Amino acid sequence: MKIEMKNISKSFGTNKVLEAIDLTINSGEVHALMGENGAGKSTLMNILTGLFPASGGEIEIDSEKKIFKNPQEAEGFGISFIHQEMNTWPDLTVLENLFLGREIKNKFGILDTKAMRKKANFAFEQLGVKIDLDKEIGNLSVGQQQMVEIAKSFLSDLKILIMDEPTAALTERETERLFSVIAGLKNQGVGIIYISHRMEEIFKITDCITVMRDGLVIDTQKTKETNVDELVRKMVGRSITDYYPPKNAEIREIVFEADHLSAEFFKDISFSVRSGEILGFAGLMGAGRTEVMRAIFGIDKLKSGTIKINGKSLTINNPAQAIKEGIGFLTEDRKDEGLVLDFSIKDNITLPSTKDFIHHGLFDDKTATTFVKQLSERLNVKATDEEQIVGSLSGGNQQKVVLAKWIGIAPKVLILDEPTRGVDVGAKREIYQLMNELAERGVPIIMISSDLPEILGVADRIAVMHEGEIAGILAKNEATQENVMQLATGGQ
């Protein structure tokens, strides 16, 4: 199958988001689609798969004009889109998820479970993976759930597969498994559109790259004919000389202390963070990093241990108490835990600090609006105004709104869990710069990251976790990818 998108444009009201886009996808090819968040990548793919119509231009499939009315019609034609937030039902089994809305029935109108099992097993065999069809999706790893989504696309004679940030939440082993599956699909003649910000992956598995910026296609070229610096320059319209901006914060007295913390998924965790310091937390998925931070913030219960801020012992049983004590927590899942997607930017940013805008029993909207405007400008949130619905923003701008929410409480300590996950290269640097500015103001920052180059480039010290314990804490001058991974995998 050959897809040609010709002169595609799209406007939402007066806002033009795509202009004169040309894109060609061939069978048996892995085609990277790159660009900053808000460049128009997802909009272009949503037009291709029929989620909404183009304002102009045309789509040809094997030289015939084609317009899909909805994603289901596109899937029936062999074009599947696996979104970053997967479309699965956690309480249903693998088999039920695979055939939801496409159940096979016998001539009596009764579900033909045997036929569905046979078809499901064949799909997984083609992928080279084994998954229990009777297991609930919610009990699978993210990598396994992704394989279910790919298997689902096999049920409709897959010809083109679109993947949006597919490795964002995968372990290293699951990522390698995915790359193996992609290679197999490519050999079977499936065309793959691969949306990612991860340069290493792009150069490892793709054949060609299309770069978008501000709703335009900047360039399309063979992967082997370009390099990281050139791609970054095309994506952001400028050269990023210091990918990790220099940090000038003075590291002073200890502000935050965790002493012998233990809970269900971790034990005997002790560490401290100083004023102006960025303490990184590294480790493999499942090591317990997020669980430690959730307990500190009062989401999960501690079994033992003490938490101190400025030498004062704290009792934190819920997030409201944590916020009252000056702890901010940007969670790893911004869409489910960090934001109310149907609320405005203003409503989201003021959520944890609403009481500060209550005067004589009434909400002071004017003061809140000024407050939000100042924060949005400081973080360079790209939006029409503070009333724009957060769900309509790009991933990078959504992340900035979550950051603004916690900066707005003037935190005594700020916890950031995967702060740049799913964020483009330009927005990443803005987040790093913001972290440096907060550190310069004396805010201690705890940052969890699964991106080793990032944590090495940003953190002053790195605590490495392995199987629920801190395996070691490394100073910046002794931290390398090799010794971090050695500690993370149980080495000494």
UniProtKB/Swiss-Prot annotation:
GO cellular component: plasma membrane
Enzyme class: translocase
Membrane topology: Peripheral membrane protein
Substrates-to-products reaction catalysed: D-ribose(out) + ATP + H2O = D-ribose(in) + ADP + phosphate + H(+)
Known EC number: 7.5.2.7
Protein localization: Cell membrane
Domain of life: Bacteria
Residue ranges of domain ABC transporter in the record: 3-239, 249-492
Keyword ATP-binding part of the UniProt annotation: yes
Quaternary data: The complex is composed of an ATP-binding protein (RbsA), two transmembrane proteins (RbsC) and a solute-binding protein (RbsB).
Family under the similarity heading: Belongs to the ABC transporter superfamily. Ribose importer (TC 3.A.1.2.1) family.
Name the record gives this protein: Ribose import ATP-binding protein RbsA
Source organism: Lactococcus lactis subsp. lactis (strain IL1403) (Streptococcus lactis)
